């Protein structure tokens, strides 16, 4: 069976390196392109802790798209890079998988229209870990019976966007299961601005950014005399690779 040819954008980022290793280690896939902002011409293998692989890092996206044979491009960069680069990728007839967060709903819809026009597949997910997907599904169901809820999400201190894409997706899913209402005391006030976190349809979300974390989230429900906490922890970035 012919292997699926995969390119990675953001190949030298934390997630990008993990994706490259996962692709190289999968018998059904072959890494044929690695796009990054540095290490031009260097073999991707040693840069991700593996032997030489034969694929060179390319810092010029135009050159990569012209020279590399790619079926699917995996993107873990940043929101602005996605908006700048993905239309060029899709115009080449390359399908795209996006794990980058920070895109607005309007931007996602715009990319969807561009993918449709280019007749390519586009898959965008806030989280590729099966445990995180289950957490969101369970939270959506729990909200039908326990509508008072807050979210605490915890990530490494290099993450740029807050709240996380997973938290935003969770909030939107929960919102489908409950009526919007203001939580907390009607006359509550903050002694320090932002103490109650961000708010979405009455639900509060809190973002923690510290060294040592990868990706974690608690969805806390409160009811009369009881609480329910649904938590997911990605202890390493390997947790995302089967989904990717």
Descriptions of predicted regions:
Residues 63-72, 76-98, 110:
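Rossmann-fold NAD(P) dinucleotide-binding segment
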Residues 9, 76-77, 99-100, 125, ...:
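Structural motif
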Residues 2-9, 14-68, 146-243:
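C-terminal substrate-binding/catalytic lobe of Rossmann-fold NAD(P)-dependent oxidoreductases
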Residues 95, 110-129, 147-149:
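Rossmann-fold dehydrogenase core element
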Residues 32, 58, 97, 121-123:
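Structural detector of well-ordered beta-strand residues that form the stable sheet scaffold
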Residues 134-146, 162:
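Rossmann-like NAD(P)H-binding beta-loop-alpha module
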Residues 86-87, 100-122, 138:
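Rossmann-fold NAD(P)-binding glycine/threonine-rich loop
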Residues 37, 101-103, 127-129, 154-157:
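Short, ordered loop/turn segments at secondary-structure junctions
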